Amino acid sequence: MLLLKKYLGLILGLAAIAMIYIIWQETAKITGEVSAAGSTSAAVALSGARVTLYEMTGEQEQRISAALANLQEQSQQEKADNARVYSAESKDEMTRSNLASFNNLSDTKHCFALEKVLDEIRKSAVRKETTDSQGHFGFRALPGRYVLEIVGQPNGQYVLFVEQVDPKWHTHFKLAEPTCHYSLTN
C-alpha cells in the first residue's frame, strides 16, 4: 500500500502522457482513397498521384470556393452550348467526334483556369505525398483550413481533384469524381 502511494503520481503521470499521445495520433488525421474512370468506364484506383495539402486563410477559402463554383458553371454552360451545336445522338461519326473534341477542349480550359486559381495557395503547401498502388493516402495536420489537391494521369487522362478540408478528428475521403479532367490524347 505504501509502495502504491509512493508511485501513484508517476503511474498517473505516465497514463496521462499515454492518453495525450493516443489522442494526438488520432486527431486531425486526413486519409482517403482516390479512383478515376478507367478505359472501360469502371473506377480504377489512382496510384502514384501527387497529393498536396495546402493551408489557407478564411479569405482565400471564400475566394477559392467562389472561383470553383464559377468555373464549374462556365464549364457546364460550354458543354451545353456544344451539345446544341453537335448532337450526341447523331448517327454521323464526325459530329460525335466533334462534340467529344469540343467537350475535351472545354474540360482543358476548365482545368487550366482551375490551376490558375490554385496558384494563389500553392506556396502554402504543408504536406506532400503520392498515393499507393490502391490509391490510398494519409496526412496528419493541425486543426485549420486546408485544400487538398490530387493530380494524376491514368489511361491518357489528366485528372485533378480539389477538396476543402477542415480536419476535426479523422477525416476520410472517397474521391471518384474529379473536379476537372481532360484527355491527353485525341
Task: Show which residues each predicted segment covers.
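A short, solvent-exposed beta-strand micro-motif common in secreted/extracellular proteins
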Residues: G135, P143-P154
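Short, acidic Ser/Thr/Gly-rich low-complexity loop/linker segments typical of extracellular
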Residues: E61-Q77, D81-A83, K109-Q134
